[in-house]
């Protein structure tokens, strides 16, 4: 039973939020040399709870809308399969999603009391967007934007909890990992194109079509690396953050694999896996760059 719930939560994708929180903490360490461990741990727990919530609610609504019965499930796309396969009850998944949302909201509420309106605004955005992600946001063609903004706000919120201020460094750094996370969502939407389109979803792949969407793929790493290189050149961030460029060979491999398999649900799996690997490696190295003294 536990394995079914871990599958429903998409445990492997939680690393995106772990990296985002870690980045906020690493920028804090680089800036001040101190971290409040209790608040850091609580932040991590709250963010993971909110991330689990959006994945569970997304699984529930995709099943209710009939999307997951139309998609071909892969290790990276097509839903978790726990509901179509009858491994968990839809109501249980929905209730679990709400419970995680409440848990994350309570932790966030604690930080609102401590740190005020900035955290309140971030928390309000998080709760509203998580609840309406699968029923509204994806239908409006804003899923990739939501993920990028979510990642950025996690970094900003983590930093603000530690420092009670926001800086250009933390905002720009947040955009870097937010865009990297959005790239993963973007590439995993290729195999789901037909089912998503039939059920009213509007991903970037649907809006532009599979072939044109391949060209959009380049934009994500260009934005992230453009910020890193530009900020390092202007001494806004440590030059050591350039170690994230070591992940470039992985993204080149991803692009090649995507081009050769854009319409093949089976052959595109390696492209999705290498894109996920790139996102995590680049993000982790970026975090490490702030810690190197």
Report each predicted region and the residues it spans.
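Topogenic membrane-insertion module of multi-pass membrane proteins
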Residues: 1-38, 42, 46, 138-144
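Helix-coil boundary and interhelical linker segments in multi-pass alpha-helical membrane proteins
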Residues: 25-45, 105-120, 155-175, 227-240, ...
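Membrane-embedded alpha-helical segments that form the functional core of polytopic membrane enzymes
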Residues: 32-57, 120-121, 125-131, 169-187
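Intramembrane alpha-helical segments
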Residues: 79-168
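Extended hydrophobic alpha-helices typical of membrane-associated regions
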Residues: 236-293
């Amino acid at each position: 039973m536990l394995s079914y719930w871990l599958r429903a939560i998409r445990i492997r994708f939680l690393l995106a939020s772990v990296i985002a929180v870690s980045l906020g903490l690493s920028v804090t360490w680089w800036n001040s040399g101190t971290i409040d461990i209790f608040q850091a741990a609580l932040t991590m727990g709250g963010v993971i709870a909110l991330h689990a919530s959006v994945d569970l609610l997304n699984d529930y609504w995709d099943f209710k809308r009939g999307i997951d019965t139309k998609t071909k499930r892969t290790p990276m796309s097509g839903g978790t399969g726990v509901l179509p396969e009858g491994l968990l009850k839809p109501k249980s998944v929905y209730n679990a999603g709400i419970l995680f949302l409440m848990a994350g909201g309570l932790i966030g509420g604690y930080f609102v009391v401590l740190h005020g309106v900035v955290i309140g605004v971030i928390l309000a955005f998080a709760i509203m967007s998580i609840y309406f992600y699968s029923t509204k946001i994806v239908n409006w063609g804003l899923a990739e934007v939501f993920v990028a903004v979510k990642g950025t706000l996690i970094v900003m919120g983590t930093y603000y909890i530690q420092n009670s201020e926001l800086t250009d460094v933390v905002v720009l750094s947040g955009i870097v990992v937010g865009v990297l996370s959005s790239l993963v969502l973007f590439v995993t939407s290729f195999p789901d194109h037909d089912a998503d389109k039939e059920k009213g979803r509007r991903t970037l792949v649907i809006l532009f079509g599979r072939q044109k969407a391949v060209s959009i793929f380049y934009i994500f790493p260009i934005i992230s690396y453009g910020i890193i290189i530009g900020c390092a050149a202007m001494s806004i961030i440590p030059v050591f953050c350039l170690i994230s460029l070591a992940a470039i060979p992985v993204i080149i491999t991803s692009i090649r694999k995507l081009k050769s398999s854009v319409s093949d649900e089976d052959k595109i799996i390696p492209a999705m896996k290498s894109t996920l690997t790139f996102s995590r490696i680049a993000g982790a190295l970026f975090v490490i760059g702030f810690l190197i003294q």
